Amino acid sequence: MIHPLSDIQSTNIGVNTRIWQFCVVLAGAKIGAECNINAHCFIENDVIVGDRVTVKSGVYLWDGTRLEDDVFIGPNVTFANDKYPRSKQYPGQFHGSIVKKGASIGAGAVILPGVVIGENAMIGAGAVVTKDVEATTVVAGVPARLINSK
């Protein structure tokens, strides 16, 4: 189901994926099967979203971002992909983040460029993630720090 009030330019949308109102998905984006992309999301060209991924409202996925299968992205999570942003000056390469299988990111977290979030990791709401997060760990705070690991 693609809501009629969304602008979906990509033809690479998996079966049973739902994209709600006021979303923009650019032509080069790839979204897997059984995903749920909530209202007011923006997905750039060089973005890959796996299967069974939930992206809550207000999330922008910039070039270079990779979300593996079974990932949860809470509302208003911010991904950055440019380490030194300047108006009308673009890097030779964007540094998107990778969110590994089964990881969850809480509401309002900020993920800085190039960060890798490990499998089944949990990012607390409002955290600012400045470096890679190991698999099966919980991080929270500003900057994000280890809270728990299995």
Describe the role of every protein-language-model region.
Residues 119-122, 128-130, 135:
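Internal alpha/beta core interface subdomains
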Residues 77, 135-137, 145:
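Glycine-centered loop/turn positions within well-structured domains
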Residues 1-4, 12-13, 19-116, 142-143, ...:
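Flexible, glycine/small-residue-enriched loop-and-beta-strand segment within the central core
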Residues 128, 143-146:
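Conserved switch/coupling elements of ABC/ABC-like ATPase nucleotide-binding domains
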Residues 123, 141:
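Conserved G/P- and acidic residue-centered "switch" motifs that form tight phosphate/ATP-binding loops
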Residues 108, 125-126:
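Low-complexity, intrinsically disordered short peptide segments enriched in small/polar/basic residues
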